[in-house]
Amino acid sequence: MSTATATGRVTQVIGSTFDAEFPEGQLPKIYNALTIQSEHKGVTIDLTGEVQQHLGGGRVRAIALGSTEGMMRGMNVVDTGKPVSVPVGKATLGRVFNVLGQPIDKRGDVQADDYWPIHRQAPPVNELSTNTELFETGIKVVDLLTPFVRGGKAGLFGGAGLGKTVILTELIARIASSHGGYSVFAGVGERTREGTDLWLEMQETEIGSTGRNVIEQTCMVFGQMNEPPGSRLRVALSALTMAEYFRDTTGADTLLFVDNIFRFSQAGSEVSALLGRMPSAVGYQPTLATEMGALQERITSTKQGAITSVQAVYVPADDPTDPAPATAFGQLDAFIYLERSISEKGIYPAIDPLASNSRILDPQYVGDRHYTIARRVQTILQRYRELQDIIAILGVDELSEEDKTIVHRARRIERFLSQPFLVAEVFIGKPGEITSLEDTIRSFEGICDGKYDHLPEQAFMYVGAIEQAEEQAKKMESK
């Protein structure tokens, strides 16, 4: 930990930004952390800021990483001489932090041996790993149509209330509970209640049959929606730095969950406006692509280890062409698009099987059988979607026999893509189902071949493998 290099004074406070003046020749570098510790009329101020601009004449403009309430001109500002640094290593496991790496779980200080700055370069190209391997999740629609890449990045795109956080929580419960490595969760600008629920859930979920809880292999970093934009902008970098340590020093496979990457862009927009930059399209910051690229390029797999990332992406007004989700979209290996019309049918997860995709849904990576079945499923659903207008006007009876069969099977496929989740057991009254990739492929192959045309549509709702649909059909007949 280096010592302070210079002391200046606050000259201006505007919202979540402040200006400070330093002696000649002692100007802090861009991204250096500044600290203000003061007490005035019984109000104690302990604030950290980050230098964003040099204004000339020894003045800098900084973004506050905490509340500026009570700040006054003339207060002393100390340049720490380095960027914000967070604790890294095994001492962080099981703990909950804020953007500065300070524990917020009321369990005492963190005895970390090392601290890393949150601003780091992405690994050089010659250090990157080029292996491509499917990462099985046990969720049918994901494994069949949008397979995740081990060491890759997957995005959950969706509007408000479509279940992004539920799917993300489910993936944590499934992957982290069967995963031997470390997990890092970044709560970026989302609800504090959801973060608390997740923390409590992780304390109860076991890692396989090891007898240990998921939280023991996880560290969590929060910058929630009630916090200043500077905190929400930098919290993803703090979490990523902790994940990078596990990747680079232990060589372990690391999982990085981010909820929500849109809030990162949103916070950047607020900071940009406070710094006086000219807004770009739809009011976003002109540096949107640069900031997103700098973050996403660090989330990668190297020869030392892998970071597999799952990121929730809020889609404003259900418009996927909005610059924030569109910028994130280009950085991902797999993208899952949540559709409101599917949610309205009561089918969850409300994943659109036609709009979602993955770069490894290719025979070269998943094999011919998997690829063929996935494309057959999508072809049937696509034809069903094309027939919707005709059905709405004329009814199913006016279709050809071939189209009637397609509609018949598409409705069963649509319902079979639903699945009971582990984290939703208390809401739907059914135990969560983890379906193996082989069972998923075999089940959909049977539906496409017409082996289960005799089963009622409702039997396919919220089951795992096809055998459960057959059991459900028998129960329905006996009633």
Curated annotation (Swiss-Prot):
InterPro entries reported for this sequence: AAA+_ATPase, ATP-synt_VA_C, ATP_synth_F1_bsu, ATPase_a/bsu_AS, ATPase_alpha/beta_chains, ATPase_F1/V1/A1_a/bsu_N, ATPase_F1/V1/A1_a/bsu_N_sf, ATPase_F1/V1/A1_a/bsu_nucl-bd
Family indicated by similarity: Belongs to the ATPase alpha/beta chains family.
Keyword Iron-sulfur: no
Top enzyme class: translocase
This protein's encoding gene: atpD
UniProt EC number: 7.1.2.2
Source organism per UniProt: Rhodopirellula baltica (strain DSM 10527 / NCIMB 13988 / SH1)
Protein name: ATP synthase subunit beta
Top-level taxon in the UniProt lineage: Bacteria
Location within or outside the cell: Cell inner membrane
Reactions catalysed according to its record: ATP + H2O + 4 H(+)(in) = ADP + phosphate + 5 H(+)(out)
Binding site for ATP: 158-165
Molecular function as annotated in GO: ATP binding; ATP hydrolysis activity; proton-transporting ATP synthase activity, rotational mechanism
Membrane topology, record value: Peripheral membrane protein
NCBIfam families hit by this protein: atpD
Key words of the record: ATP synthesis, ATP-binding, Cell inner membrane, Cell membrane, CF(1), Hydrogen ion transport, Ion transport, Membrane, Nucleotide-binding, Translocase, Transport
Record function comment: Produces ATP from ADP in the presence of a proton gradient across the membrane. The catalytic sites are hosted primarily by the beta subunits.
Subunit structure, as described in the record: F-type ATPases have 2 components, CF(1) - the catalytic core - and CF(0) - the membrane proton channel. CF(1) has five subunits: alpha(3), beta(3), gamma(1), delta(1), epsilon(1). CF(0) has three main subunits: a(1), b(2) and c(9-12). The alpha and beta chains form an alternating ring which encloses part of the gamma chain. CF(1) is attached to CF(0) by a central stalk formed by the gamma and epsilon chains, while a peripheral stalk is formed by the delta and b chains.
Record keyword tRNA processing present: no
TM helices/strands, residue ranges: none
GO cellular component, one term: proton-transporting ATP synthase complex
Matches recorded under PANTHER family: ATP SYNTHASE (PTHR15184), ATP SYNTHASE SUBUNIT BETA, MITOCHONDRIAL (PTHR15184:SF71)
